[in-house]
Amino acid sequence: MAILNRFSEMFSEISTWRRDLHAHPELRFEEYRTATFVASKLKEFGVDEIHEGIGGTGVVGIIKNGNGPKIGLRADMDALPITEANQCSHVSTNEGVMHACGHDGHTTMLLGAARYLSETRNFKGEVILIFQPAEEGFAGAKAMIDDGLFDRFPVDSIYGMHNMPGLETGSIAVGPGPRMAAADNFEIKINGKGAHAAMPYQS
């Protein structure tokens, strides 16, 4: 298949992008270097429109090819406040911050898709590339939406994915309906008599 052959050709370069992003992780809404990296790559690929600073540090790129559906592809960019213990050439250079959830990979995959789609234009319509900040519990998607993401760049459908270590290389896992749950917070207050954990019968 032509697409697999092209990505095989790009593999080494794409791997370099991922390692660069992994070595320079940034926390929620602080993805300034990452956003600049993304925007520069999109410009290099010949993406038709590039919009920065959406919802803080979000980036949107648009690839056009005639009339047709508008399809959104989304990836997250932020890292976590974790000290990396790995020993590798691309270990985090930002002390106390690490790409422990694979968003460096997500960003890289969407950049790879952007390059391929911009090169080939083998579709009709528009592809909206959405690089989201602050996925890790800080409502980066909401920030982009509140900043007019879908008013400015409406889509007919939108797709995202999450890496899943343990899957065989070259395979993907899919299923009907939502596949990832969102987290929420709540507080509950209990009034009653307390006791020691070793003597719960006294409570």
Name each model-derived stretch.
Residues M1-H99, T108, R115-F123:
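Acidic/His- and Gly-rich active-site-bordering loop/insert found
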Residues V59, L80-I82, Q87-M98, G105, ...:
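Histidine/acidic-residue-rich, glycine-tolerant segments that coordinate divalent metal ions
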Residues G112-A113, Q202:
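Residue-level detector of alpha-helical segments with a strong bias toward transmembrane helices
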Residues A113-A114, I145:
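Short, well-ordered amphipathic alpha-helices
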